Design a protein with these regions (language model features):
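Membrane-proximal basic amphipathic "stem/tether" segments
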Residues: 1-38
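Short N-terminal helix-initiation segments at or just after the protein's N-terminus
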Residues: 20-31, 89, 148-158
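Short, flexible, glycine/charge-rich loop motifs used to bind or transfer phosphoryl groups or to couple energy/partner
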Residues: 30-33, 45, 69-72, 199-201
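Short, flexible hinge/linker loops that cap or flank conserved catalytic cores
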Residues: 35-36, 48, 203-204
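Conserved SAM-binding loop
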Residues: 39-125, 211-215
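S-adenosyl-L-methionine-dependent methyltransferase catalytic module, highlighting the catalytic core
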Residues: 95-104, 108, 112-220
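Serine residues within intrinsically disordered or low-complexity segments
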Residues: 222-224
Length: 224
């Protein structure tokens, strides 16, 4: 028990130190990495988990709800791709649409935003209790979720912002799971059919609505 408490204490300390570092140096580091990247792909909402080809960000300097952050850090139409895993459900409906429009502005024509959110049509009552607004998963007091999306409502949100939507994973109203193959090199979604470790023995314990929101353009961004 003592060891467990000490490990928790160390994790909290590391988290606090990382937050201090990000507040002081994160924006400078982000600018340097972005300037050096031949393909400009960034992750929003997760500074700790990202693939090597992607540049992480932090809301201290690139908050989806603060357009001035984006204007200070980026030029419109300059990004090849964005990735947001389990971010949009933390935004109010008004914030969600405004954030989608921000992403549309800063993507190149043909660029894309890969999004994953909890699936409001997942057939497991336990899953829904975890992910619904005000719900609480294991070890959580509350999940901080504002909206529980389905494939229809999430797709409509991004279409309303001007995107063309490609759905990859979702449950439908009849409880059937739909899957279209997607390349993790184009943005790994960890809470998905293939990559979530809770999905064992053919049982889909935790999945997401996964889609690409593509900004229309003459040439779609290369995905490699």
């Amino acid at each position: 028990m003592w060891l467990v408490r000490q490990l928790k204490h160390v994790r909290r300390l590391v988290y606090r130190l990382r937050r201090v570092y990000d507040r002081r140096y994160g924006a400078q580091k982000f600018r340097r990495r972005l300037a050096a990247a031949p393909i400009k792909r960034i992750v929003v909402g997760s500074a700790s988990k990202h693939d090597l080809a992607w540049i992480p960000t932090d809301r201290d300097y690139l908050d989806l709800c603060r357009p001035e952050h984006w204007a200070q850090m980026l030029a419109p139409g300059s990004l090849d791709a964005l990735l947001a895993e389990h971010v949009w459900e933390h935004l109010t409906p008004e914030e969600a649409l405004a954030a989608a429009k921000i992403c549309y502005t800063y993507l190149k024509p043909g660029g894309y935003l890969r999004v994953a959110v909890p699936d409001g049509l997942h057939p497991s009552p336990e899953y829904i209790d975890w992910v619904k607004p005000g719900g609480a998963g294991p070890g959580q007091l509350t999940n901080g979720h504002q909206v529980l999306y389905t494939y229809r409502t999430l797709g409509h949100l991004f279409e309303s912002a001007g995107f063309r939507v490609r759905l990859y994973e979702y449950y439908d109203e009849m409880g059937k799971f739909h899957f279209s193959d997607w390349d993790p090199a184009d943005g790994t979604i960890r809470r998905s059919r293939r990559f979530d470790r809770r999905n064992q023995g053919g049982k889909l314990a935790f999945t997401s609505v996964v889609l690409d929101a593509v900004k229309p353009g003459a040439t779609e961004t290369s995905r490699s």
